[in-house]
């Protein structure tokens, strides 16, 4: 006895894995038409239904777009196109309308994504939380995907991102701190990582932290310790390293109202103060010592930092040590005397 069920063929397009065969068409009394024939595969200037649906599973918005294109470029009916796309006719005809609150949230999300082009949806959610405290990360992710804001992965050489940052001279202590990382190795070839922080105005070394690994949260703790003695800066200047673009570091700058100046990738001259300091640090300290342990490296580097701040003359400070330069500035400001000459070009 011949079964009346249609034959199944594996590997078919997005139709549930089956398509009618010649025998099935003869049994049902209808003509034999495959999906390709119905969609007009052989017609010049037309794409098949498979062409509109090939690839990964589409979101509802993309499915509506695919259905519209099939209706425009193929002889498929609306019912057939919706069935191929896996979307009901009601969902195709009646797209959801976002509420005014969702529209405002989406507009703000797009604005932040355009400002911070390398931030993902979780970091953007951190920025949006103060303005939209009741919105969770799942809704942010949905709006993030709908707006096609996904950050592209860089496969090759880095390209400049963002606008060029002009390097401005600071006018007072704690106006801007510049920071960066310097790497070296112990005698056993184990790597050490040094966080260097410099006050752009006084040229003082605010801190040099030495460890095998320094994360964004570690950087925040070190800066809080330095601020206990010096106070917090108005702004910090960094590169686009993961430690300085981490959620912990961004939250720290927002908590204390600190401006975060990010330089362009591959443009170290935009962070010239810390690059100059790092050159002196490597030439006068790291290249002159062979560290056998992390403890020794910390002791030697701490001694060099004290010598740099208190004894070593600095040309940008008028040939006096940075600590003396800072003390002279505070004295002049306290006495309210003649305007202080920073001596940057003496």
From Swiss-Prot:
Q: Which Gene3D superfamilies match?
A: Ribonuclease H-like superfamily/Ribonuclease H
The molecular function terms in GO held by this entry are: nucleic acid binding
Q: Where is this region: Disordered?
A: 1-50
Protein name as annotated = Insertion element IS476 uncharacterized 39.2 kDa protein
Point to the regions of Basic and acidic residues compositional bias: 29-39
Q: Which organism is it from?
A: Xanthomonas euvesicatoria
Q: Which Pfam families match?
A: HTH_21, rve_3
Where does the record place the Integrase catalytic domain? 169-329
Q: Which GO terms describe its biological process?
A: DNA integration
Record keywords: Kinase included?
no
Q: Per the record's keyword annotation, is Ribonucleoprotein included, yes or no?
A: no
Q: Where is the signal peptide?
A: none
* Protein keywords: Transposable element
């Amino acid at each position: 006895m011949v079964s009346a069920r249609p034959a199944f063929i594996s590997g078919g397009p997005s139709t549930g894995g089956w398509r009618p065969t010649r025998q099935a068409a003869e049994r049902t009394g209808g003509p034999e038409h495959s999906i390709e024939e119905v969609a007009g595969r052989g017609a010049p200037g037309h794409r098949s239904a498979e062409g509109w649906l090939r690839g990964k599973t589409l979101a509802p918005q993309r499915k509506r777009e695919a259905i519209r294109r099939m209706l425009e470029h193929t002889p498929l009916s609306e019912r057939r196109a919706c069935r191929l796309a896996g979307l009901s006719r009601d969902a195709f005809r009646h797209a959801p309308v976002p509420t005014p609150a969702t529209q405002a949230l989406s507009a703000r999300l797009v604005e932040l994504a355009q400002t911070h082009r390398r931030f993902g949806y979780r970091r953007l959610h951190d920025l949006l939380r103060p303005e939209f405290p009741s919105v969770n990360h799942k809704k942010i992710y949905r709006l993030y995907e709908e707006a096609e804001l996904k950050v592209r992965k860089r496969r090759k050489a880095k390209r400049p991102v963002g606008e060029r940052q002009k390097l401005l001279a600071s006018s007072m202590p704690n106006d801007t701190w510049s920071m960066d990382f310097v790497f070296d190795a112990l005698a056993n070839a184990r790597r050490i990582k040094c966080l260097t922080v410099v006050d752009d105005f006084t040229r003082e070394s605010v801190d040099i932290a030495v460890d095998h690994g320094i994360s964004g949260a570690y950087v925040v703790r070190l800066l809080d310790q330095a601020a206990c003695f010096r106070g917090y800066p108005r702004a910090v200047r960094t590169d686009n390293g993961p430690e300085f673009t981490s959620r912990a570091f961004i939250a720290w700058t927002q908590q204390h109202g600190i401006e975060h100046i990010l330089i362009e990738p591959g443009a170290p001259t935009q962070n010239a103060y810390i690059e100059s300091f790092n050159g002196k640090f490597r030439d006068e300290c790291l290249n002159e010592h062979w560290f056998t342990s992390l403890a020794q490296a910390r002791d030697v580097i701490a001694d060099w930092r004290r010598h740099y701040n208190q004894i070593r003359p600095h040309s940008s400070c008028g040939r006096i040590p940075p600590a003396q330069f800072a003390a002279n500035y505070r004295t002049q400001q306290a006495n309210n005397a003649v305007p202080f000459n920073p001596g940057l070009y003496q």
